[in-house]
Amino acid sequence: MNAQTPIRRPISLVLASPRGFCAGVDRAIQIVERAVEKFGAPVYVRHEIVHNRHVVDRLKALGAVFIEELEEAPDDRPVVFSAHGVPKSVPAEAKARQMIYLDATCPLVSKVHVEAQKHYDAGREIVLIGHAGHPEVIGTMGQLPEGAVTLIEDLKDAAAWEPKDAANVAFLTQTTLSVDDTADMVALLRERFPGIAAPHKEDICYATTNRQDAVKHLAEQSELILVVGSKNSSNSVRLKEVGLKAGARDAHLIDDASGIDWTWFDGISRVGLTAGASAPEDLVQGVIDAISARFDTTVEELVEARETITFKLPRLLTA
């Protein structure tokens, strides 16, 4: 061995599966790509289509123009609504302006919208468990008249909620929160209102649950966990928190391989790697390559679940 060649320390890299894109994110990105193909550039997109900088930058390069509000888009160009969902007023405005619009709302989020309307039509008072200001929460609350949905962010909110008719209430949850995330609040609501109407089990986002369950098992056999995802991605932030709570010594959220601080690896022999639902697999591969370039790396996969779900594209793009 050449005297100048450093000794490469061994590292075991455990990949969580599933990780990265879920069916809703995959569909939303395809909608923007297909819209640019069909209608040419520019195609306007209201809000980040998904919360990932790399995805947004790539779509910008294809001809997508990201805007905050519909008023920023001209009447004669197509507009796409993000995967997080939008208030009812947004498609209503697009219709009034006779715009071509494509709704990339995740079908699981759309299910929550349908449930909200059903509860409202049945005269129930509704609480939504979620994070204030998150686009999905804004979209869900915007399905109904102002004041029809009360947002609950923590146990304090759940304890303080006083409906007019305690026997006629319902709760909904933000899809990027798992069963674990909401368990304490749901338990308190059920204790206070035994007859509260709850979401169907199949309406809970499979991707959020699967990715968090995978990270829990990853934490059992990793000293350090790296989560590939953007800081404004709710589900990515939660993956890091779940990893720490499940016993990982350290966990970090990184945009890509350039976000790695190599001092994190000091004294570490087993590293877990996962990605949020809006993070592309090529960024995960970039992290694997960066670690493999520095260490004698063995890669193994920890399979929590196999995901086969796909969602159909809007008819306008497939006709």
Curated annotation (Swiss-Prot):
The keyword 4Fe-4S applies. [4Fe-4S] cluster binds at C22, C106, C205. Isopentenyl diphosphate binds at H51, H84, H134, S233, S234, N235, S278. Pfam families: LYTB (PF02401). It is an enzyme of class 1 (oxidoreductase). It catalyses: isopentenyl diphosphate + 2 oxidized [2Fe-2S]-[ferredoxin] + H2O = (2E)-4-hydroxy-3-methylbut-2-enyl diphosphate + 2 reduced [2Fe-2S]-[ferredoxin] + 2 H(+); dimethylallyl diphosphate + 2 oxidized [2Fe-2S]-[ferredoxin] + H2O = (2E)-4-hydroxy-3-methylbut-2-enyl diphosphate + 2 reduced [2Fe-2S]-[ferredoxin] + 2 H(+). Binds 1 [4Fe-4S] cluster per subunit. Pathway: Isoprenoid biosynthesis; dimethylallyl diphosphate biosynthesis; dimethylallyl diphosphate from (2E)-4-hydroxy-3-methylbutenyl diphosphate: step 1/1; Isoprenoid biosynthesis; isopentenyl diphosphate biosynthesis via DXP pathway; isopentenyl diphosphate from 1-deoxy-D-xylulose 5-phosphate: step 6/6. Its EC number is 1.17.7.4. InterPro entries: LytB/IspH (IPR003451). Gene3D superfamilies: 3.40.50.11270, 4-hydroxy-3-methylbut-2-enyl diphosphate reductase, catalytic domain (3.40.1010.20). Belongs to the IspH family. Catalyzes the conversion of 1-hydroxy-2-methyl-2-(E)-butenyl 4-diphosphate (HMBPP) into a mixture of isopentenyl diphosphate (IPP) and dimethylallyl diphosphate (DMAPP). Acts in the terminal step of the DOXP/MEP pathway for isoprenoid precursor biosynthesis. This is 4-hydroxy-3-methylbut-2-enyl diphosphate reductase.
